[in-house]
Amino acid sequence: MTNQQDYTQDNDKLYRYLFQHRAVRGEWVRLNKTFTDTLNTHQYPKAVQDLLGEMMVATNLLTATLKFAGNITVQIQGDGPLRLALVNGNDQQQIRALARVDGNITENMSLHNMIGKGVLVITIAPKEGERYQGVISLDKPTITECLEDYFVRSEQLQTQLIIRTGEYEGKPVAAGMLLQIMPDGSGTPEDFEHLTTLAATVKDEELFGLPAEELLYRLYHEETVNLYPAQDVQFFCGCSAERSSSALLLISDEEIDEILAEHKGRIDMQCECCGTHYFFNKEAIEKLKSTRV
């Protein structure tokens, strides 16, 4: 078995695993630097940080179930002090997240009080083929419970999600597990209940501080678990000067000139996700205008 002191080897990793004698599949993910990189450029309230961590882990686990190249967006929109929380991840486990806050959010504020009247929207976008979008009612106390209900309703698959956020050794961390009965119909409710009962005993410090192999052994030492190679997880925004230029081209020349005059001849565009600044002076703007068709 892996030594507990080596837990960092599985930081920012996602694992898939199967049970040899039970038709249930599993996933495990832990976000360390990925989560920290997401929070570093924002001063989100603690409750929003925790919610984003929960959504990021859920998105990683969801994208790991994809059988095609593409991405998944998990988005909350509401009329409460948390106007928007959005996470986007792809099949390469590249992920980004952002939130928009308009009002006071206390540390222990509930999901419903943060969001008010709102919905959870999941968008699945294959690189090839049609997009699928599902709208989920936020009628459960947590996003995790709402997503479990989504799996049962949309895919008719029994699914357990265990997601925790917090700190480990003084640093933010978010981690989670997914258990799902196999879609081929060979799994039994009894097998699923047995494994989910064991998974529910997991402690925060185990999710945050153990390598995947050791954690699974502690939970399922009487089972034969086939653990597949890890996939790296990383924060990846995807913004660029080119994309900022394209956004400017959506504005009329007159509006651009007004912005230039107001900001002393320089436009500063900041990425809402990662905080990167893109600057355009008058010369760059004139060159950009000349590219209009």
Swiss-Prot record:
The GO terms this record gives for MF are: protein folding chaperone; unfolded protein binding
Report whether Chaperone shows up as a keyword of the record.
Answer: yes
Q: Which UniProt keywords apply?
A: Chaperone, Cytoplasm, Disulfide bond, Redox-active center, Zinc
Concerning PTM, the database record says: Under oxidizing conditions two disulfide bonds are formed involving the reactive cysteines. Under reducing conditions zinc is bound to the reactive cysteines and the protein is inactive.
Give the matching SUPFAM superfamilies: Hsp33 domain (SSF64397), HSP33 redox switch-like (SSF118352)
What cellular component GO annotations does this protein have?
Answer: cytoplasm
Gene3D superfamilies hit by this protein: helix hairpin bin, Hsp33 domain, HSP33 redox switch-like
Name the major location: cytoplasm
Magnesium is among the record's keywords: no
Protein origin, superkingdom: Bacteria
Function of the protein: Redox regulated molecular chaperone. Protects both thermally unfolding and oxidatively damaged proteins from irreversible aggregation. Plays an important role in the bacterial defense system toward oxidative stress.
Q: Do you know which NCBIfam families this protein is assigned to?
A: PRK00114.1
Official protein name in the record: 33 kDa chaperonin
Recorded source organism is Haemophilus influenzae (strain ATCC 51907 / DSM 11121 / KW20 / Rd)
